[in-house]
Regions:
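Mg2+-dependent phosphoryl-transfer enzymes with acidic/Ser/Thr/Gly-rich catalytic loops
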Residues: 1-5, 22, 187-268
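Asp-based phosphoryl-transfer active-site loop
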Residues: 2-18
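Active-site metal-binding loops of divalent metal-dependent hydrolases
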Residues: 10, 45, 218-219
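Active-site phosphate-binding/coordination module
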Residues: 20-122
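Hydrophobic packing residues within well-ordered alpha-helices of enzyme cores
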Residues: 25, 50-54, 164, 168, ...
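Short active-site oxyanion
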Residues: 36-40, 59-61, 151, 211-212, ...
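Short, structured coil segments at secondary-structure junctions
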Residues: 56-59, 67, 75, 172-174, ...
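Conserved acidic, metal-coordinating active-site core of Asp-based
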Residues: 96, 100-216, 220, 224-225, ...
Length: 268
């Protein structure tokens, strides 16, 4: 099978635990792109936080951000699509978080909001690449000044996030998607969003069949993408529930798992 697209999650998959792209992985990606393969980074991060990958390319490559709630072209910064969360659902989510006393982040396109300044939200702000966090305590107050809500994100310890995820999935049902890109994050996005949906849309834009796609990931939020791709790959550090839906398990994110896949299935 000649694969035409590689889609890879970033944190826990493409980058190592120090958030670094290793030289081996960089070279594998560059060689794949030079061979005509489309490389798509698919992440929960905002667009401002994917420039370490974007900088590898001379070509304009698509990036899936906010766990599939939006996609941009890397060089031209052209918006390909955006799937906002229904405002009333976003407000309901935010209000529940306020009652529970949870540290919350809200993305409205490229703009960053937090429900208060605390260790968790300030740390998130610090990794958001030159973006300043505005404070909001009631989403109704910003409804008229934003285009829409890309996602609401709760930050808590991993055990609490696991508990909250089960509760919120039961509460919202199919009205929205609850996903977790990191053990301490619980994210709420539109039911029309998701990495799998976004990957399908990009594949259609480029005329690529799902059988011609390799997807690589490590988290619960990657499962829909891994299932959509013709060849789903889990990194070794992924939990068993992710490995169970995949066709292949590669090395861990600290051992150049993405590079191993590219070298074995693209550059062989």
């Amino acid at each position: 099978m000649k694969y035409k697209m590689i889609a890879s999650d970033m944190d826990g998959t493409l980058v190592n635990d120090k958030s670094e792209l290793t030289e081996r992985t960089k070279q594998a990606i560059i060689k794949a792109v030079d061979a005509g393969v489309l490389f798509v980074a698919a992440t929960g991060r905002p667009f401002s936080n994917v420039q370490n990958v974007n900088g590898l390319f001379d070509k304009d490559m698509p990036f899936i951000i906010f766990n599939g709630a939006a996609a941009y072209m890397g060089k031209s910064e052209k918006l390909l699509f955006e799937r906002f969360l229904d405002f009333d659902l976003a407000k309901e989510t935010f209000d529940i978080g306020q009652k529970l006393g949870i540290a919350q982040i809200v993305w409205t396109g490229p703009r960053l909001w937090g429900n208060r300044r605390c260790d968790k939200t300030v740390r998130y702000e610090s990794i958001s690449k030159n973006l300043s966090m505005s404070i909001v305590t009631d989403l109704a107050a910003i409804k008229d000044e934003v285009d829409g809500i890309s996602k609401v994100l709760w930050i808590d310890d991993p055990a609490k996030v696991k508990e909250l995820s089960a509760e919120m999935c039961a509460h919202f049902g199919t009205r929205l998607k609850c996903v977790s890109s990191m053990p301490h994050f619980l994210e709420f996005i539109s039911n029309d969003a998701g990495k799998g949906t976004a990957l399908e849309e990009i594949a259609k834009l480029y005329g690529i069949d799902r059988s011609e796609i390799i997807a690589i990931g490590d988290g619960q939020n990657d499962i829909c993408m891994l299932k959509y791709a013709g060849f789903g790959v889990a990194v070794e550090n992924a939990p068993d529930e992710v490995k169970a839906v995949c066709d292949y398990v590669t090395l861990s994110n600290n051992d150049d798992g993405v590079a191993e896949v590219i070298e074995k299935f693209i550059l062989k």
